[in-house]
């Protein structure tokens, strides 16, 4: 299994022209991915049991996001905060945030491969919450980007993946309190 892990991540380097993936059949790669994917689902995602071990980390990071956003929005000037993270940490955050594809429950272990795909998050990732102020002080919209791609959120959208900050703040405050 360790050779599989090296093989699937080795292609991201330009150090060697050899493919370690050639050591496996297509069926072996699929079976090993399903094991690896299930491991991440159980450890970093919603898991089969609704209480998963990494949840508190995701809640902590989400709380920090929300706290910093509240601070920044109180200022009367543009503010930028950059956030980067490793794939395993980001999976936990995406799950806690209830993002589509990261928080869907599996019916059983064999269903995990249908609702969770650990390869959808690169080893190095970034999250951006971009805020747009309207004419009124409390008229604020937010749009979420994951690795520079617009990401849907579990709230009622206003237009194409824009959300009212008051809805996002209330929803994620509830998640933080429950965590």
Where are these regions (language model features)?
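Signature for phosphate-centric chemistry
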Residues: 1-81, 85-179
């Amino acid at each position: 299994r360790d050779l599989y892990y090296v093989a699937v991540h080795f292609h991201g380097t330009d150090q060697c022209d050899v493919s370690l993936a050639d050591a496996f059949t297509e069926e072996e790669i699929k079976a090993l991915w399903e094991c690896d994917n299930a491991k991440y689902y159980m450890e970093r995602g919603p898991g089969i049991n609704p209480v998963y071990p990494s949840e508190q980390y995701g809640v902590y990071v989400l709380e920090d996001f929300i706290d910093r956003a509240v601070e920044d929005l109180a200022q009367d000037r543009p503010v930028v905060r950059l956030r980067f993270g490793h794939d395993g940490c980001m999976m936990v955050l995406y799950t806690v945030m209830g993002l589509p594809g990261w928080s869907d429950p599996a019916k059983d272990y064999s269903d995990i491969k249908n609702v969770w795909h650990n390869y959808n998050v690169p080893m190095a990732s970034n999250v951006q919450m971009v805020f747009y102020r309207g004419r009124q002080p409390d008229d604020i919209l937010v749009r979420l980007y994951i690795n520079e791609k617009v990401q849907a959120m579990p709230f009622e959208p206003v237009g194409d993946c824009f959300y009212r900050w008051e809805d996002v703040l209330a929803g994620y405050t509830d998640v933080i309190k429950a965590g």
